[in-house]
Amino acid sequence: MLDVNNFDRMRIGLASPDLIRQWSSGEVKKPETINYRTLKPERDGLFCERIFGPTRDWECHCGKYKRVRYKGIVCDRCGVEVTRSKVRRERLGHIELAAPVSHIWYFKGIPSRMGLLLDMSPRSLEKVLYFVAYIVIEQGDTPLMKKQLLTETEYREHREKYGNRFRAGMGAEAIKELLVEMDLEQLCRELRQELKEVTGQRKVRAIRRLEVVEAFKNSGNRPEWMIMDVIPVIPPELRPMVQLDGGRFATSDLNDLYRRVINRNNRLKRLLDLGAPDIIVRNEKRMLQEAVDALIDNGRRGRPVTGPGNRPLKSLSDMLKGKQGRFRQNLLGKRVDYSGRSVIVVGPELKLHQCGLPKEMALELFKPFVMKKLVEDGHAHNIKSAKRMVERVKNEVWDVLEDVIAEHPVLLNRAPTLHRLGIQAFEPVLVEGRALQIHPLVCTAYNADFDGDQMAVHVPLSAEAQAEARNLMLSAHNILNPKDGRPVATPTQDMVIGSYYLTIEREGAKGENMIFASPDEAIAAYDAKSVHLQARIRVRPTARLQEALEFAKSEARSFDEQGRLMTTVGRLIFNSVIPPKVGYVNEVVGKKQLGNIVARCYDKLGISETAAMLDGIKKLGYTFSTRAGITVGITDVEVPEEKRRLIAEADSFVEKVEQQYRRGLITEEERYQKVIDIWNKTTDGVTQALMRTLDKFNPVYMMANSGARGNIQQIRQLAGMRGLMADPSGRIIDLPIKANFREGLTVLEYFISTHGARKGLADTALRTADSGYLTRRLVDVSQDVIVREIDCGTHEGIPVEAIVDGKQVIEKLSDRLTGRYALEEIVDPETGEKLAAYNEEIQADAAERIDQLIKQGKLAHNAVYIRSVLTCRTRYGVCRRCYGRNLATGRSVEIGEAVGIIAAQSIGEPGTQLTMRTFHTGGVAGDDITQGLPRVEELFEARKPKGLAIIAEQDGIVRIVDNKGRKDIEIVTDDGESHHYAIPYNSRLKVEDGQRVQAGTELTEGSVNPHDMLRVKGIQGVQTYLLREVQRVYRLQGVDINDKHIEVMVRQMMRKVKVEEPGDTDLLPGGLIDIADFEAENLKAIEAGLEPATARPILLGITKASLATDSFLSAASFQETTRVLTEAAIKGKVDPLLGLKENVIIGKLIPAGTGMSRYRNIQVLVGDEIDEARLEDGMA
């Protein structure tokens, strides 16, 4: 077997007949499989032991040699080599064909490679291969043309007329002859010449032919190898035959397909020996060709061969294709040992880095470790007795188990694993019962709840795996979310309501304005029930409190005249778990504030302090939410008094609008729009009235206001009015639901509201699948983006400013700058302080300040130039400076970080939260702009969007002209040229007469076609557009994603250029090539004094970009497996194994993190060796 770690590239190509014979261990001559009586393989059959090796370890077929001592002997009676039976997984056989057959991939694939080489249409080729027509091989001195097709009758006529002066044939033999005599060099020269002379369709055809010819010429594959004389037979263990209980046999479909090939082949041999008539032989040859086609790719041509029950048989191609194929099922999705799964329950007393592991489960998972320890400690004499002890569960076993699991982390995973936080490491704590216990703070990351969710446990075995789990995957180290750098382990639900109740201030409570000498005294008074938890009190600051106040926000420092702190007992208790350096919290704490506290703590004090603080907040939160005893009853839902008046007003307004409509003063469309506006305003009015009337201590209000559960919209439906609903098509019904759930809905109102509810459920189901598929494509396109060096040395970057949509700020400038490297020095004009230095990271406070200065217009320009992944020059992957900060750690990104995968997960994971719907908000018909998930997909796939906007292609002044009742636009450029744009009837203009526009400005509403944007505004224009649009969709749904993740994707979409003129290089016109390769080719040409090639950048959708990758393994395991492999084989492609996927497929360590060669090729030197090495270095 080959050693996986010993090679660094992998090549694929066409196998010549001689090579196949060389691989083979013997020829399969009979279609038999196994003998039905003895159940032993038949000799020379598909399972023959002589060819493929023995079925039992160290035992020959006839039984003359048994035992390992005869290893390597070939039995003289049965010819079987005595060896391990697992050779039956690797030994190939072969079938010698009586007549050559074509390989269906190369004849039937699109484009047909054989057809392009021979310059024949696939239809004519099919006629020849399947014995319908003759093809002229040598025309001699006859008027026939070479490669001309002749029907049976034409062939006979010409035979009678010219005798043997010409040669024609049919079937794969004829094609093979034509392929053998091809001169690729000559053909290549002719085609390159032809390219210079022809245009249009003929040029396209010539380019495609040249591609195939060049591929054969450069790869060393011969064209005639596309026709097979020998067929390899895959090892029998890969197409097994097993006996079922009833004595019947289940067999792999491949055996059936091979059997048909062998039967037909043997029959053909017999017919040829007998000298049968031509027509019978031809028919048999055609059947052989069809049998081989079915074996290689069943169903590609004609009707698929079916097995029992009309099920199409699975051919070799089907074994590789799709989710159940070899690539995705076995190579990328392996099963693991040492794992278990169980239901999860909450473990509120666990620490952040712990999980509760059921005892019986732990014993089974750590069995080998326990057995080893039992022997070491002398409880058992040998492994066998230790095993018996464990199986009988003796008392000593539990003590040993405790020792074994100490310091041994386990991994917990919840499906679906949408991002890397879906697998985290914990230290196990043994618990009774059979359920896993989960710390409540990691639920957000797992998206877990306790309504019956299950989780899987995995045990990292090797020391390296344990170190990795502990240092990188421990839950306490994953407090920040990689997608936006915000804390993901923030308290939720009960903990939030507890903290909220603890820190809220109640006026007129018992003990108000009492004065205490220290926080401890205040807390003692609360314990003695002399002061209420939420009463406002005054406290003299102690040393710890003083320190906390120094770090606190200015609002928190409210003192009375004597310098005593004004606060509440609850806040003192809350601050007892907050480290002083985070600052004293003197405000009402809801979910948002908790998030900020965690972020601040992580920033200032690091991981261990934050984890301890989180556990403190968790404990307090649970304690006080229990003490508060917050409950919800129907009386807590109070309907505001003003509701009746507001609704009556709205009804009268609507009546007026209806009257205007009936008199014909307004159109149906205007009526609809007005009614909807009236009801939207009324709904808002009722909601505001509701919020005014609700008491600050109303449990429903407290829940929503603190962020523990629910929101204003839901309270509105409970106690305000439900408002407008949409019908099944998404159009808003202009009859609102005036009632709320407290009052109860009428039958009609209930019916109207069911549309929305049902659509919501259907949407969710569809969305999950779509989002998953989008994530898969994103991962595939970016999986080889790894941080490979510190600095790529580029001086380019991108300008960034706040992303604005109309009046609404979608993404603040400070969010876009934090943690990125600046390309220019920025100095504060007021203080002269340096806010950003060239090639250094911009910190959060500096980013905020730059944002302020730009808003006040105090900096020279509005955009800040930063280093970006989009302009990074690293060949495979990105560099540290262009990427900037790793959001999951808050520090600069490490070399070896797989930032592509992180980006894909960060964009894909929130995908399920995006809505599906296309909004039809009244307005103009046909103006439905796609939004939500479909819009993200449309952008990443670079599709032409629905509802196209027309964009200006020049800079100039807009003139709006009337053209037969519709508005058209003319743009007058600075040199006086006028350009006309026809505007469709139902489009709305976005520009005004006399406005100055730049190229790329949208003239009408809608979405821009990104390919037009690339043409008009160039690479940077389209990159900014895609980034802005994707951000818009996510931010409008309230999902924050950092720019850099989207940049990684956009960069992968823009990796290729299309060659226009090849100049004197070897590039093919119209070919796609990586920018870096293109530049290298041109550099070579210029150095040699030749003419360089020209090319234009193109934008590929993520699916296309994944398939256009350098790695054929990655592309084949993604989609269109057969097409990718066909092309790769003809080109003799070499896979450089740089991405993660390829290495997982072949079983190598992935080249990320410590798997990178720079971390692995390290020599450890000791003592004197170091001095010697230094001397050598000095001499070198």
Curated annotation (Swiss-Prot):
Mg(2+) binds at D449, D451, D453. Keywords: DNA-directed RNA polymerase, Magnesium, Metal-binding, Nucleotidyltransferase, Transcription, Transferase, Zinc. Coiled coil: none annotated. One of its GO terms (biological process) is DNA-templated transcription. Signal peptide: none annotated. It catalyses: RNA(n) + a ribonucleoside 5'-triphosphate = RNA(n+1) + diphosphate. Zn(2+) 1 binds at C60, C62, C75, C78. DNA-dependent RNA polymerase catalyzes the transcription of DNA into RNA using the four ribonucleoside triphosphates as substrates. This is DNA-directed RNA polymerase subunit beta'. It comes from Heliobacterium modesticaldum (strain ATCC 51547 / Ice1).
